[in-house]
């Protein structure tokens, strides 16, 4: 499996997540969520792994007006709007296959001592 870290270059939690994996010698791929973002399939997979779209949104972030709009539109429109505006998502998003976490959660990123290059993300 390949660890993917979605975040921004300026985000401290994203930097801490990168440092966490780097210090343990675990290979990962960094994807800038503003420049490239997640594909629709990746996005749906992360939403499903984290209890739905509502849990992915950083309601306390800088985009208050956009968050307010998202609260009142249909589910299909919410998905499209957040997919278009991925800066609304809690970051970093750390993916390993179908498993993922939102935010900096080193306690969830369990290391498999037999394979230093793989990480198991528990579903806590």
Question: Which residues are covered by each model-predicted region?
Answer:
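Local sequence-structure signature of Cys/Sec-based thiol-disulfide redox active-site neighborhoods
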Residues: 1-24, 28-33
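Thiol/selenol-based redox catalytic cores and closely related redox-interacting motifs
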Residues: 33-124
